[in-house]
Amino acid sequence: MKFLRLSTLALVGLGFLTQTTLCDPDTDEEFVPTEQKPFNIRVTYEIDEHPQSFESTKLIELVNGEEISVTYNIKNGEDESVSVVGVAGSFNDPVTGLTKRNLTASSVGPLKLLKDMTFEFTQKIGIDLEPENYLFVPSIYVLKDDQLMLLGSKNQLITVSDPQISVFQPQMLFLELVLLASFGGLIYALYATFGASYFQKPATAPKNKKVGSSNVRKTKKNK
């Protein structure tokens, strides 16, 4: 868990569909603070396009160009109130853990959560990554005792691929028509420049009538 001053974080943009709050009497009475998790604040999420993704260990397949909805559920198990102020995240290398793409931090609320209160909201994420495997690492910004905390949750292994191209897609059909028209125009231009003169029939010279012999015969008869 990381602590940041509020002035060091720029929360920009909105990427949410719904924001709802509800009371949840179920608390973690056996919570014991640790160095990794000093506060009793639970963060879970679901990728709406892949139900039960939080509980599953399966690889989630995503396609470039699609938009996914990540619905977060944050429960405050602390005796003091906390405020949810933002959400971010990243796509990391699953082997090295190094960040490959950061998600722009987006503001939430701020919404004050009393003890045992739950806050739920949905974040929209457009997929535009190099086709390979990633770890989706969510990050929630919570304000507690004038300190900004960066809370994490379960990391999700995903694989990203490019969309399959079909020749019957409207864009492909239009491109095919343009290529055919261009090819037809090129053939016509070549024919008009070179082919017309090549296929044209050669002109034949007119035949001369033989008049000399007939005149000679007529002269002989007259004698």
Curated annotation (Swiss-Prot):
Membrane topology value: Single-pass type I membrane protein
A Gene Ontology cellular-component term: endoplasmic reticulum membrane
Stored InterPro entries: TRAP_alpha
Protein origin, superkingdom: Eukaryota
Intervals, Cytoplasmic compartment: 193-223
Family: Belongs to the IRC22 family.
Protein's job: Is probably involved in a pathway contributing to genomic integrity.
Protein name, as recorded: Increased recombination centers protein 22
Provenance organism: Komagataella phaffii (strain GS115 / ATCC 20864)
